[in-house]
Curated annotation (Swiss-Prot):
HAMAP family found in the cross-reference section: SfsA
GO terms for MF: DNA binding
Lineage: Bacteria, Bacillati, Bacillota, Clostridia, Moorellales
Coiled-coil blocks: none
InterPro entries: SfsA, SfsA_C, SfsA_N
Homology family: Belongs to the SfsA family.
Stated name of the protein: Sugar fermentation stimulation protein homolog
Disulfide bonding pattern of the chain: none
Signal peptide, first to last residue: none
One Pfam family named in its UniProt record: SfsA_N
């Protein structure tokens, strides 16, 4: 479980001038906020959408006074912070609540692998070292979570690095954290990124482990609650 910032401000989404900036309105005042999710989010960031902002903890040279934390759509809270899944994975690993990684502990983060960096290296007594790459998922259609919501050459490269590590005797896993509660299963987004879709199937066939988890989100906390089926 990860705690969200206290005293979130409910506002109405107006526009997204660039990938990392959101303009929202509250009681007639325009608020400019940083968005820590570079995805397209076109099915979420619709005019009039209910968003939740947190005052920036440090101003410094920032151009925005707020951070976008959540969006609420049809009663479902959705986290819009693509950095959060790594914290969720680390917390669940430490709590021993991730069945595929029982007996493992965190050894390192941002681990060099070929021309990339992978999120985690795990170790455990009597277990082979395990490299893990975590991906944030926000797009869900009719209970089916889809990744990615925009083409991601980086995502395909990470999968190829995991395949190379597995071929050298390491465990290698891609973990998709669905930052909402209404997903039943996860699949690659074939239409948006056919290259990633074919690469993840190739990776799974080569022995890379693929997992997906959905989250429970409220205005106070976010927690991983259950694995969901992965459809490749």
């Amino acid at each position: 479980m990860v705690e969200l910032p206290a005293n979130l401000i409910k506002a109405t989404f107006l526009s997204r001038p660039n990938r990392f900036t959101v303009v929202a309105a509250r009681e007639g005042e325009k608020l400019v906020a940083f968005l820590a999710d570079p995805g397209r989010l076109t099915e979420l960031l619709l005019p009039g959408a209910e968003v939740y902002l947190a005052p920036a903890s440090r101003q410094g040279d920032r151009k925005t006074a707020y951070d976008v934390v959540l969006l609420r759509q049809n009663g479902t809270f959705i986290s819009l912070d693509s950095r959060l899944p790594n914290r969720l994975f680390a917390a669940a690993l430490q709590a021993g609540s991730l069945e595929p990684f029982k007996g493992y502990r965190l050894r390192a983060t941002e681990v060099r692998a070929g021309s990339s960096r992978l999120d985690f290296l795990l170790q455990g007594d009597g277990h082979p070292p395990c490299y893990v790459e975590v991906k944030s998922v926000t797009l869900v259609r009719g209970g089916l979570a889809l990744f990615p919501d925009a083409p991601t050459a980086r995502g395909s490269r990470h999968l190829r690095e995991l395949m190379a590590l597995h071929s050298r005797g390491y465990r290698a896993a891609a973990v998709f954290i669905i930052q909402r509660e209404d997903a039943i299963s996860l699949a690659p987004n074939e239409v948006t990124d056919p290259c990633f879709s074919s690469t993840i199937r190739e990776a799974a066939a080569a022995g890379v482990e693929i997992y997906a988890y959905r989250c429970h989100i409220d205005p106070v906390t976010v927690s991983l609650i259950a694995p969901v089926m992965v459809k490749l």
